[in-house]
Swiss-Prot record:
Function: Component of the origin recognition complex (ORC) that binds origins of replication. DNA-binding is ATP-dependent. The specific DNA sequences that define origins of replication have not been identified yet. ORC is required to assemble the pre-replication complex necessary to initiate DNA replication. Binds histone H3 and H4 trimethylation marks H3K9me3, H3K27me3 and H4K20me3.
Gene name for this UniProt entry: Orc3
Post-translational modification: Multi-mono-ubiquitinated by OBI1; ubiquitination is important for efficient DNA replication origin site activation. Ubiquitination levels are low in mitotic and early G1-phAse cells and are induced in late G1-/early S-phase, peaking in S-phase and decrease toward the end of the cell cycle.
A Pfam family hit: ORC_WH_C
Name used for this protein in its record: Origin recognition complex subunit 3
Matching SUPFAM superfamilies: ARM repeat
Tagged with keyword Ubl conjugation: yes
């Protein structure tokens, strides 16, 4: 019997079933990020300023990545737009010749190779949809395999999305097509709807966002299939066959989003169906190239003060290269690193533009000055100073602030020079055999972050190979180095650019005598007529001695000077960041924290959550061993660890009820406890079901009322 406001609603005699709308459920409340910075545990007087600095810096980095992705996809999208605008020319001309009719049976199809980074496909296809709507046609539809198990659902989803793209969404006339959504999903009715809409569009309304496609009498319909590999073969075959029969009245263009290889088209479609497609291949930028560009714009630049240590960068790149190839995940990893840096490092308030950082140093409090003195890099710096200066740095706040401003400026100049020399060195080493210092600049960057690169065997090997470069190769590399140095707006390397230009001039001025000398020294001595072993060995020894004692040519001397110059640049400017005072202000080095958040082991995470819920819930009552107030699944998990291979459900339920009732201090004889026992039983069933879902137990027929305890490999 219902009570309260619903009593009158259930008083009917003839009705036996009553339907009620569910009560409004509050949405899950998400804690804003700034609340974490205002937490009492974060004992810092500038926590609000740190959060504001984080927000501004991330917005700058985010806008840079968005602009970068637009530039990377611009060429691909332009080619796709050209392809789509050239499709269905006979349809636009209303040509009725035999050749046109034959072509009407071929559906223009763009095979878009996006790569295996499936998580990035949505972003790319979303941008592509917007581009096509702005430049080609307003009728752009995207479908996923999970929404299209058969042709009926395929047409239903296709039709509903297509009608949402109709000419004027605010026009009442267009709503006449909505009846089609609920009644009929066939290609004939869709063609009729398209014909009616385009005729109305020609006379009454203008197509939304119809800019570059104004010459189209009837805009084409573009269908994008996300992850073509996920679609069933029969659905694709049926839809393509049906659509090809209606191309003369429904100008369809297909775009296949392919993650693997174009071969998938022939695997899913037989020749009789694939022959109905006019396929053109489009290749997006590879994942590794995309990663290199993102690193180049976000980290290998003095434009943004935030930097990653070697281990933190390796965590992000390893997740990218060995897990998902996702640029979006990599960018989220950088965002998480930035957030962790500003949250955990009190002096991250100085991780901003140099001018702003100097202003903030001037208003530092005594406690903030003490934070500077506690930095390990600053301690090492103080230890290397004269005694009088040490005392001033440790006792005089004014002198400390002035020196901090100077060190921050030195750190800024260090990064400018560092990245210029790094790019120059990469130009020299990226084309060497076997790539001793890596083929990608990120590999060279990680090596330079870790240690003094000139002490490594790889660097010495690379230098030996560079000393054997030909003149043309060396001149080409030096020209690229000049382009790198000229591209920098801040000239900090002194006369380095001029010296490289002087080297180029000297190479160009090598006269013919040096070439003849080089040829003469490289040619073998003449007159070796005897071929016996004794004379051959004697000749080889003479040639070796001649090579050892010969005077180097002008080219060899000049090449040696260039290599020595580059070696000195590396030793002067590619010092590891740990050698710089105050590097902790801008470098995030908590690689373990990053790994726990981004690359957690599922088994360890599950066991930790169930065995020690305090680790995640941060509830003081749950600290230590699992108390009675822990979540039900934690109690059930702890009890199941005490059982053998087969678990008696009755004993398990009684033990669970004993633990829970002890926590709630209920009287077993009371009426309330009898009602609660049913609730406890339901809670136990839910906990057992959750453990089964996680793979800890499974049903068994060996014994009645028993379940089998599982391990990760089996029973």
């Amino acid at each position: 019997m219902h009570t309260g406001p619903r009593t009158m609603a259930t008083s009917s005699v003839s009705k036996g079933c009553f339907v009620f709308k569910p009560d409004f459920k509050k949405r899950k409340v998400f804690v804003p990020i700034e609340d974490y910075f205002n937490n009492e545990e974060l004992d810092s007087e500038d926590s609000k300023l740190r959060f504001e600095t984080y927000s501004l810096l991330w917005q700058r980095m985010k806008s840079e990545t968005e602009q970068l992705q637009e530039e990377l996809n611009e060429n691909l999208f332009d080619n796709l737009v050209d392809f789509l605008q050239k499709s269905h020319p006979e349809f636009q001309k209303n040509s009725r010749d035999w050749g046109s009719q034959m072509k009407f049976r071929e559906i223009p199809t763009a095979a878009l190779i996006l790569g295996v980074n499936v998580t990035d496909h949505d972003v790319i296809l979303r941008s592509l949809t917007e581009t096509l709507q702005n430049n080609v046609t307003p009728y752009v539809v995207s479908l996923q395999a999970k929404d299209c198990p058969d042709v009926k659902h395929f047409l239903q989803k296709f039709t509903s999305q297509l009608m949402d793209c109709c000419v004027d969404r605010h026009s009442k006339e267009v709503t006449s097509g909505k009846a089609l959504k609920k009644t009929n999903y066939s290609m004939d009715s869709l063609c009729s709807w398209y014909s009616a809409v385009t005729q109305k569009a020609d006379h009454k309304v203008t197509i939304k966002k119809r800019t570059a496609s104004g010459h189209w009498r009837s805009p084409p319909v573009v269908l994008i299939l996300k992850s073509m590999e996920s679609f069933t073969s029969k659905v694709l075959q049926d839809f393509i066959t049906i659509s090809s029969q209606h191309l003369h009245e429904f100008p369809l263009i297909l775009i296949f989003g392919i993650a693997t290889s174009p071969v998938i088209i022939h695997r899913l479609l037989p020749h009789s169906v694939s022959s109905l497609l006019c396929v053109e291949l489009f290749q997006s930028l590879s994942c590794e190239q995309h990663l290199t560009v993102v690193l180049d714009k976000l980290l290998l630049t003095p434009q943004f003060p935030f930097k990653l240590s070697k281990k933190a960068l390796q965590v992000l790149t390893n997740i990218f290269l060995y897990h998902d190839f996702s640029i979006q995940s990599f960018i989220k990893g950088i965002k998480l690193s930035l957030l962790e840096h500003f949250y955990s490092q009190p002096l991250s308030v100085l991780c901003c533009d140099l001018s702003e950082a100097k202003k903030r140093v001037n208003v530092f409090s005594v406690s903030q000055c003490e934070n500077i003195r506690r930095l390990p890099s600053f301690r090492r710096y103080v230890e290397n100073q004269p005694l009088g200066k040490q005392v001033a740095l440790l006792t005089n706040e004014t002198f400390l602030k002035e020196k901090t401003q100077s060190l921050l400026e030195d750190l800024h100049v260090y990064h400018i020079n560092y990245f210029l020399v790094l790019r120059c060195l990469h130009n020299f080493t990226s084309s060497l055999p076997k790539y001793p210092l890596g083929r990608q600049i990120r590999e060279l960057y990680c090596t330079c972050l870790e240690k003094k690169i000139w002490d490594s065997e790889e660097y010495k090997s690379a230098l030996q190979l560079l000393r054997m470069l030909a003149k043309d190769e060396l001149v080409s590399i030096l020209q690229r180095c000049i382009e790198v140095l000229d591209s920098s707006t801040e000239k900090q390397l002194g006369n380095t650019t001029q010296k490289i230009k002087d080297f180029l001039t000297q190479f160009q001025n090598l006269d013919a005598d040096s070439k003849e000398e080089e040829d003469a020294c490289g040619s073998q001595p003449k007159g070796l007529q005897k071929t016996d072993l004794y004379h051959l060995q004697k000749s080889l020894l003479e040639m070796k001695e001649l090579r050892r004692t010969k005077k180097p040519t002008k080219f060899e001397m000049l090449r040696e000077n260039v290599m020595n110059f580059i070696d000195n640049l590396v030793r002067d400017y590619l010092l590891p960041p740990e050698s710089q005072p105050l590097h902790e202000v801008v470098y995030f080095s908590a690689a373990n924290t990053l790994r726990e958040h981004l690359n957690a082991a599922p088994r360890i995470a599950l066991h930790t959550a169930l065995n020690n819920p305090y680790y995640y819930l941060k509830n003081e009552e749950l600290e230590g061993c699992i108390p009675n107030t822990a979540p039900d699944i934690c109690i059930a998990y702890k009890l199941h660890l005490e059982c053998s291979l087969l678990i008696n459900l009755v004993d398990w339920a009684e033990a669970f009820a004993t633990v829970v009732t002890a926590a709630e201090k209920m009287d077993a004889n009371s009426t309330v406890s009898e009602e609660m026992s049913e609730v406890i039983h339901a809670r136990f069933i839910r906990a057992v079901s959750e453990l089964e879902l996680l793979g800890f137990i499974k049903p068994t027929k060996q014994k009645t009322d028993h379940v089998a305890r599982l391990t990760w490999g089996g029973c």
